[in-house]
């Protein structure tokens, strides 16, 4: 009797949640959404638009989960197979074009789980010990996994494609070249890299520009991979590899680069991060940061919440905005902003390439110990981010700054890769 009542209650909640979602989707203004649920089809938005998306409900509990968990539950229920889409990127793009509606959905769907997610995110903050566990949770998943979908330079950051026809390999090599040229690296330079990855940039810079490189990571898996790579290349005399938190680094350097590491710093620690970058640079030194950014207009709202990526992909992660980084440079350092380059759409292309290669690898992943839930999680992660970059709710910038002192650089390099 109790089981029957529980089932009846769940069914009632599912129906109520379904009706609430359908009512909210009736306010869709941009693009067209087709929602399929069993034999029913519901169309929302504007017919004849350039953006069409489809959502197929596989389990009626989807609506209840969405009511209780909001956008995070949307990702969870994708992983669990409660819904699917023939093109999840298009669905993310459609929702990104309807941010007012999306905000309304988030306020009405998910308020019950918000306090739990916020507390959990706070517990993942990037203290010295927290940073190591957060980095390990993502980057120590196994080098074989990353080798399967990254390029030969093992670049887990956005490519900069030199042409519409360029491959992932072309784009990542162009990105490495662009970074080195914008820093105007030469044989007399000592470059500090905060966030080694698997060592690709350090090896590229030392090999092609003859500079000395000190590079640091707090991922044991990345450190061990980079150590072997540096030895194979015979670059041990040019590259110093550290397993150390950036906050503990000492000395001064001619040039400093940090590629998509700032997202792992955490909002509360950004002032310390910029002060440390400034301390580590010699007078006249140059800095290049490659960063995923959130739109300035949505930054405050973003800081108040927790999204799917922070919950399941990058624990402790937090995107900066361009204005925030410029403000921190001015308030916390003596550095001056020299140039800013936007490459957001290049990241959308990069993610599309990664996802294609990841899905091609997917049939082999269970043999390596990865579950179907993991595969679906990462598929959604790639689609979620790609859609955001295409619609510019997030973007990718390279920020160049300089310390006071003798410039030692031309300042008028041609800008490539836009």
Residue ranges and their predicted role:
Residues 293-409, 415-418:
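Substrate-binding/catalytic lobe of Class I Rossmann-like enzymes that use SAM or dcSAM, i.e.
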Residues 247-257:
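A short acidic, Gly/Pro-enriched loop at the edge of an enzyme's catalytic core
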Residues 212-217:
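Conserved SAM-binding motif I beta-strand of class I
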Residues 271-283:
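A short glycine-rich, Lys/Arg-flanked "PGG" loop and its adjoining helix->strand segment in the class I
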Residues 187-195:
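Conserved class I S-adenosyl-L-methionine
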Residues 284-292:
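Conserved beta-strand signature within the Rossmann-like core of class I S-adenosyl-L-methionine
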Residues 198-209:
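Conserved SAM-binding loop of SAM-dependent methyltransferases across substrates and taxa
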Residues 1-172, 178:
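Feature captures hydrophobic
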């Amino acid at each position: 009797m109790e089981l029957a009542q529980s089932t009846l209650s769940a069914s009632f909640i599912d129906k109520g949640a379904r009706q609430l979602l359908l009512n909210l989707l009736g306010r869709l203004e941009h693009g067209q959404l087709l929602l399929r649920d069993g034999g029913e089809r519901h169309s929302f938005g504007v017919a004849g638009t350039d953006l069409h998306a489809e959502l197929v409900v596989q389990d009626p509990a989807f609506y209840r989960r969405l009511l209780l968990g909001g956008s995070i539950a949307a990702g969870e229920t994708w992983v669990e197979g409660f819904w699917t889409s023939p093109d999840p990127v298009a669905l993310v793009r459609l929702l990104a074009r309807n941010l007012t509606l999306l905000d309304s959905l988030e306020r009405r769907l998910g308020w019950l789980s918000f306090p739990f997610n916020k507390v959990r995110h706070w517990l993942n903050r990037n203290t010295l010990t927290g940073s190591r566990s957060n980095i390990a949770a993502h980057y120590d998943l196994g080098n074989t996994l990353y080798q399967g979908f990254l390029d030969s330079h093992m670049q887990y950051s956005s490519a900069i494609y030199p042409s519409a026809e360029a491959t992932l390999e072309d784009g990542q090599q162009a990105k490495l070249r662009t970074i080195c040229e914008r820093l105007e690296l030469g044989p007399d330079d000592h470059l500090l890299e905060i966030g080694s990855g698997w060592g690709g940039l350090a090896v590229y810079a030392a090999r092609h520009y003859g500079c000395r490189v000190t590079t640091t990571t707090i991922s044991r898996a990345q450190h061990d991979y980079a150590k072997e790579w540096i030895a194979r290349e015979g670059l041990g005399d040019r590259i110093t590899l550290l397993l150390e938190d950036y906050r503990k680094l000492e000395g001064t350097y001619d040039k400093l680069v940090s590629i998509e590491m700032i997202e792992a710093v955490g909002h509360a620690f950004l002032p310390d991060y910029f002060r440390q970058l400034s301390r580590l640079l010699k007078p006249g030194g140059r800095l290049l940061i490659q960063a995923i950014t959130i739109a300035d207009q949505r930054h405050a709202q973003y800081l108040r919440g927790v999204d799917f990526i922070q919950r399941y992909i990058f624990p402790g992660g937090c995107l900066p905005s361009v204005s925030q980084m410029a403000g921190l440079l001015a308030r916390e350092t003596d550095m001056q902003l020299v140039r800013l380059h936007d490459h957001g759409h290049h990241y959308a292309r990069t993610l599309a390439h990664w996802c294609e290669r990841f899905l091609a690898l997917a049939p082999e992943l269970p043999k390596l110990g990865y579950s179907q839930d993991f595969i679906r999680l990462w598929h959604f992660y790639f689609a979620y981010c790609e859609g955001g970059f295409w619609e510019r709710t997030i973007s990718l910038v390279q920020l160049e700054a300089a310390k006071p002192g003798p410039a030692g650089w031309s300042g008028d390099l041609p800008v490539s890769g836009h």
